[in-house]
Amino acid sequence: MKKRNIYLDNLSFEDARKTLSDAFKSSELTGIETIAVYDSLNRVSASSVTALLSSPNHNASAMDGIAVIADNTEAADERNHLELKLGSGFKYVDTGDPITEPWNAVIMVEDLLEADERHVVIKSPARIWQHVRHVGEDIAAGELIIPSFQRIRAVDIGAMTAGGITELEVFRRPVVAILPTGTEIIEDPETMSEGAILDSNSRMFAAMVLDAGAEPLRLKPVIDDRQLIKEAFAGALERSDAVIIIAGSSAGTEDYSADTIRSFGEILFHGVAVKPGKPAIFGRAGNKPLIGLPGYPVSGYVIFDRLVKPLLELMQGIGSAAEEFRSGFLSRRVPSSLEHREFVRVKCGKVGGRTIVSPLNRGAGITMSLVHADGILEIPQESEGYEAGTEIEFRLTRPASEIDNRLVSIGSHDLLLDVITELMHKNGGRTGLSSTHQGSMGGVLAIRKGECHIAPVHLLNVEDGRYNEYLFGKYFQPEETALIKGVGRTQGFIVKPGNPKGLTGVDDLSGELVYINRQRGSGTRVLLDYLLEQKGIDPDSIDGYYREMTTHMAVASAVKSGTADAGLGVYSAAAVNGLDFIPLGNEEYDFVVRKDMLDDPSLQTFIDCLKSEEFASELGKLGGYELDEPGRIISFS
């Protein structure tokens, strides 16, 4: 039996940070280099910089106008205008021109009453040195411009240049080697085959290294061979100031990172009490950090963001940039284990003056949860989580300005939401759409609790076979809410090309096929349960009934990958994935909205998108939709 790794530690997040700060000192980690001032943006000064020249280096005119001798203008006032002659009484100057003897004041061109090429008339005297910039007024020779250990900004470059500085000493940017490992890892999407994984992690980490001010050295993936990995690691260590090895940090039989790091130095800790990201490894070879990041992208991101990035900033002699936090109210419960500090990706938006926070998929391999996230909620290790409605504080991962002008949507999923999001961004980006998929009933409850602006729904009234309108009066006060018409769409079974299981309808679900379901509360799940009840089919007889996905695309992906034979969804999801589709019938996909939102500019933008020709064109390309006055508002009071 192959030997498996074990985690040596379950170090708390706080202890992990302290261990790293104690193990590495910034003064020992990087050298110093001299570079041109104009190349120094975002670099860190290694020594103080003092001005060689004064700025301005001569008495200079601060305005366009005329230079005069102040004493010769004393006779001018409102009743006794004074005429001056070019040469003896004044000379023309532009902003920045030297003011030399005998001139000692400047009168702005706007204050001249009459002027020709050789004469001007003034109505008030000039004070000595009026509108004249003195030598060293901005920067004096010998004055400190920037201290050491300062991240250099654009204004610093301007000031140094004005002070006669052409070069300065900065800390050398640490070079961070990034070594992806895994036999399944490939770089070229054209060589993709079953079981292969594109090397996206090293690209993400290289960008994060750049963002932290360091220089990435991205290496080619190495297969799961202990000797080859060690050889590649040795080369990476020789060429860099720090090495990141990706994957191979957990407890698998082919996880070689810990052994490799131990071969070249010492392991400081292996295992951190965080979720996701527990398998992380940190070690050192001399003063060089050696880092093993988990292969799951979210796990790797969390460890890099919270532990590696501060370490790279330490190596450059700078503190971590200030982070922006915001408080908000959770739209649903977020449980957590007492064993870890948990980092939960969240989406948010302002509804009725409150920030509503919705947790996203918490899987360690869900890269898109990072893309969609507006922030990170950190749950302390000793906490069991938070109940729905709890006011919490979270860290923003995108600018607040992008969040505050959003239309918040909670409810059913459809690909048309992606189309609307793109159209709203094309509108100038003034308004966006923040969409969280919690199913139609999730949207109904969110509207009732004031947690969203709109709720996409497609809920069947089993008594009359109509969609959505019955919600008004049953769940909503008709005078407070309205319905925005969306689209008709075709629901049916998504199956593999050629329908190899011969699925024709719900009667075949309890046969020898594996099903993939939508989550409870979704309109698609409600439809399936209604059809099963009509046919008298026990859900327990369906293999996969309790295996749930939150979107139509996730259902289609499961069928395409072979982990399921069929799932109920919309035609467009099947078409996009090249799958076959067994139609069951049409339904109505609409939007519930509070009436007090109807005049809101962001909602008007949303409605305009629904009514647009571009929206109709894009849905025509997807297929499976019928448009009958999308954007029409129906009131039930």
Question: Where do the model's predicted regions map?
Answer:
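Phosphate-binding glycine-rich loops and their immediate beta-loop-alpha structural context
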Residues: 134-245, 405-424, 430-431, 435
